[in-house]
């Protein structure tokens, strides 16, 4: 499964995203980050995601600079 996240291109953004995945005990298998000016985009590939990703997505949106979260290839 993958999660796509668009956000402001600011210091410690990757650290904040990683902290959310750590909180939910989700291993990040691969992370791709790209930015242009003030905007950035991450695609995070995970080994597994919980069947209900509502709390994970809410915690990602709780990061002030996150603009959009999209769960891709969620099974179940």
Go through each PLM region and give its residues.
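A conserved regulatory-domain signal marking ACT and ACT-like small-molecule sensing domains
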Residues: 1-76
